[in-house]
Amino acid sequence: MMSDLPRDLLEERLSRVPVKSLREARFTCKNWKTLSKKRSFTKKHLAQEATSRESEFKVVMVLHCKVYLTSINLRGIHNGFDPSINRQAKLVSLNGTDQIDISEVYHCDGLLLCISKDYTRVVVWNPYRSQTLWLKPSSPDHRMDWYICAIGYEKRKSSLRYKVLRFVDFAEEEFVEYEIYELKSNSWRVLDVTSDWEVEFYARGVSLKGNTYWFATDKFPEISSNLIHSVYFLLCFNFTSERFGPRLHLPCYPMDVDTVSLSSVREEQLAVLFQRKDNLHMEIWVTTKIEPEEVMWSKLFLAVDMQPLTDFKFGIADASFIIDEEKKVVVVFAKDKDVMYPTHNTAYIIGEDGYYKEVDLGKTTDKIRDPLVCSYVPSSAQIKQGGKRKKKGKLITD
């Protein structure tokens, strides 16, 4: 029997179990459960997961307000093989909270920050460790207010302290409050922030090296000839200093009607998708250096005329995407080509030399929200809840 194998050999075998099946393996045998919690096994298992990522992407997808672990396989696409996108497991918790509709997910160091559709509930989740932490808002929520959330960490000498940032835009008062939550102390604090910029409520931040980046614009833009001239730039929140950095330049010059979206590359670089409304020309740029106070951009990663391919512009707020640097392709997640009455969710795979493929993600039940995708890398990060017992979550094969 497998349970009778020597520990080192058993550890080697278990390390090959996919993340989605690890929880089931833990409950198969008491010895396996004990072994799976040891640091040596965790290190080996995460190394095995890193090896598997060389052949396919692991992402988290929000579809129909549910959260799925999804694999994207692009092997052989330039040699006649079709790409594949498969939902492998649904992320749920053990206390019935899988019935809650999730509208947004953010990833940082293996942790997922999930926001409920009605903005009343926020949860931090580590699917690898099956841990969840529900955050209680510091003040009552108001339906007419807007919220922007982000997750990151403070760098200590020997550890990382995870934090959640929340913007509360009080609609009636035209006032924005910035709050930060420390997972370790289980407490909210209000930050003293004075800004001459603003982040739109629909803007999605991207976490990188423990910090979060957004597109931002002037709070008081110039107006001439009755036209508003907004200037867009990159803005970083440093979770260690708990301060926003200076304005960082973009490699493009978007207008209000253009599509501009952020993504991460291997949790080391930022990528920008930029598509003009007037001619549907799409560009992808990638950073060569990215820090809270400095950014450098590579030469153009990809440039494609989308008019003969899709003949429509991706949504201003919904164009979530990933890129494969080696294969020189971008995967954009949106609705089908019927702009007025879409019936299906679709992944558009676009590359050099005219490469173009569509992958049907199934019928859509949400006419407003496009599929939302963010990168996911499993980690052994612990969710600490101020001494309180953590609730458990799990992966269920879809």
From Swiss-Prot:
Pfam families: F-box, FBA_1. Residues 1-45 form the F-box domain. Gene3D superfamilies: 1.20.1280.50. PANTHER family: BNACNNG10540D PROTEIN, F-BOX PROTEIN CPR30-LIKE. NCBIfam families: F_box_assoc_1. This is Putative F-box protein At3g17620. The lineage of its organism: Eukaryota, Viridiplantae, Streptophyta, Embryophyta, Tracheophyta.
